[in-house]
């Protein structure tokens, strides 16, 4: 009998061992929990500053007052909703029938002897000694505060506002960022940007603060010092979303400067649509022909992407060596011709698609990556902030080819939205020019915004009003003489 039990135990032990070995060989995969959404406590409220306190100190007084008004309004709205929800839940609970208390009474009766014993012990304790009666003189009154100067009073008032703003920001319903913007004259300005605003709204705010002309060439410019890449924000992009992709220790910067490349496409479309066709029209074109070309390219059933193709240098992954390949631009992405194949559609290989990708200009990549020339552009996902194998580097032979490829990618990615952005910028520039001619410094209010969530300075959501192509051409003649070039 004992031998049989020993055999059973041994068999059972062997079975457990085999099960352990089988489990280890299969490997148990752990299910990764999804990353939680960033709460207001984890959300970084500043870009370009050491901390939130420093950024609030950098705000102008009127901007700080406007921030406080917005925060108080947001929090009051949340409190009203909370009170309403509590009232509703209270009414629902009052309808529910109260449970019987018989069981509770029985339970308390069982505990009553313990309570009686505890009370008896308390009664046996001696009373505490009386407090000593000491005749101490009263403390001297505090010295009267010295009167504050006007500057000290203003500084204390601002410090109180900042302290309150720090508390309210964490309770606010709408995300707000204090952004340090580097100006064209090497100075900086601090702006409060909320999650409803697009680039066009921020540019309008900067126009009001700087009183500079509202040329269509002004832009917000994103610079990555570590990767040595840069690009301009498109006017319809949500600024807070873009900046939220930056890491907390990022050295990235936001610049406010003029870049003719931003809307060069609409001033001289022939340089992008006809340059590779060998036509004489690509050199000179009158205003009427330019307008017709833009209408044909952007206002038809679908947006026409420039027929762009040619040899480019491709940086190999993880190396500082470059290979020359033949690339073609299509609406869905960039394709290349494999070695020994033809340019027919069936032989083309997809290099990259534009969904969730941004295009950047490279800066000094000839030194950093041993590129053949300094005319480089880069394609990467917005959330990639460090060196990565998923970043694509391409190099062109000359500057004109570089601008053609970057502009062609923007057309393929954004389509007619790019043209709408330009028309809105031209309209804004025309209104600003009219105000300047009337001798007033008051900036013109925008006629419309590019997104339904965009907000004007007065807190109202503007109606989208885009000018016709004829109005754009007429306004552009007055504002930008370069259109005749």
Curated annotation (Swiss-Prot):
Pfam families assigned: PH, RA_2
Comp. bias (Pro residues): 125-147
Membrane topology summary: Peripheral membrane protein
Domain PH: 305-414
Residue ranges of domain Ras-associating in the record: 175-262
Location of this chain's protein in the cell: Cell membrane; Cytoplasm, Cytoskeleton
GO biological process, one term: signal transduction
Region (Disordered) residue spans: 84-157
Recorded family membership: Belongs to the MRL family.
Name the record gives this protein: Amyloid beta A4 precursor protein-binding family B member 1-interacting protein
Encoding gene (name): APBB1IP
């Amino acid at each position: 009998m004992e031998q049989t039990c020993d055999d059973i135990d041994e068999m059972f032990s062997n079975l457990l061992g085999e099960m352990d070995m089988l489990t280890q060989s299969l490997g148990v995969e752990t299910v990764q929990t999804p990353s939680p959404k960033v709460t207001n406590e984890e959300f970084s409220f500043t870009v370009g500053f050491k901390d939130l306190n420093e950024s609030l100190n950098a705000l102008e007084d009127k901007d700080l007052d406007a921030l406080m008004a917005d925060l108080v309004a947001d929090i009051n709205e949340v409190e009203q909703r909370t009170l309403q929800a509590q009232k509703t839940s209270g009414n629902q609970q009052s309808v529910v029938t109260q449970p019987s208390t018989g069981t509770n009474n029985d339970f308390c009766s069982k505990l009553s002897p313990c309570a009686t014993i505890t009370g008896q012990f308390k009664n046996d304790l001696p009373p505490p000694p009386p407090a000593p009666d000491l005749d101490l003189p009263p403390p001297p009154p505090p010295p009267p505060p010295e009167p504050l100067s006007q500057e000290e009073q203003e500084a204390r008032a601002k410090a109180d506002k900042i302290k309150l703003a720090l508390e309210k920001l964490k309770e606010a319903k709408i995300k707000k960022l204090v952004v340090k913007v580097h100006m064209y004259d090497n100075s900086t300005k601090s702006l409060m940007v909320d999650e409803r605003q697009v680039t066009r709204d921020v540019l309008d705010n900067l126009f009001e603060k700087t009183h500079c002309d509202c040329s269509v060439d002004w832009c917000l410019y994103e610079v990555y010092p570590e990767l040595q890449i840069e690009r301009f924000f498109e006017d319809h992009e949500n600024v807070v979303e873009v900046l939220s992709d930056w890491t907390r220790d990022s050295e990235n910067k936001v610049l406010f400067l003029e870049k003719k490349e931003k809307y060069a496409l609409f001033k001289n479309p022939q340089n992008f649509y006809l340059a590779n066709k060998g036509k004489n029209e690509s050199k000179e074109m009158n205003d009427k022909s330019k307008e017709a070309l833009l209408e044909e390219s952007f206002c038809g059933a679908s947006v026409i992407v420039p027929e762009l193709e040619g040899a480019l240098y491709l940086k190999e992954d993880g190396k500082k060596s470059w290979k020359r390949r033949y690339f073609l631009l299509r609406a869905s992405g960039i394709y290349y011709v494999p070695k020994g194949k033809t340019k027919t559609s069936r032989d083309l290989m997809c290099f990259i698609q534009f969904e969730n990708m941004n295009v950047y200009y490279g800066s000094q990549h000839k030194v950093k990556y041993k590129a053949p020339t300094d005319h480089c552009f880069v394609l990467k996902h917005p959330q990639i902030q460090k060196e990565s194998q998923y970043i694509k580097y391409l190099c062109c032979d000359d500057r004109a080819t570089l601008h053609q490829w970057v502009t062609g990618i923007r057309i393929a990615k954004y389509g007619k939205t790019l043209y709408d952005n330009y028309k809105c910028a031209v309209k804004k520039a025309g209104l600003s020019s009219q105000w300047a001619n009337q001798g007033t410094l008051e900036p013109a209010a925008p006629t419309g915004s590019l997104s339904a969530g965009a907000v004007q300075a007065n807190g109202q959501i503007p109606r989208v009003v885009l000018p016709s192509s004829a109005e754009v051409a007429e306004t552009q003649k007055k504002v930008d003489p370069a259109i005749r070039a």
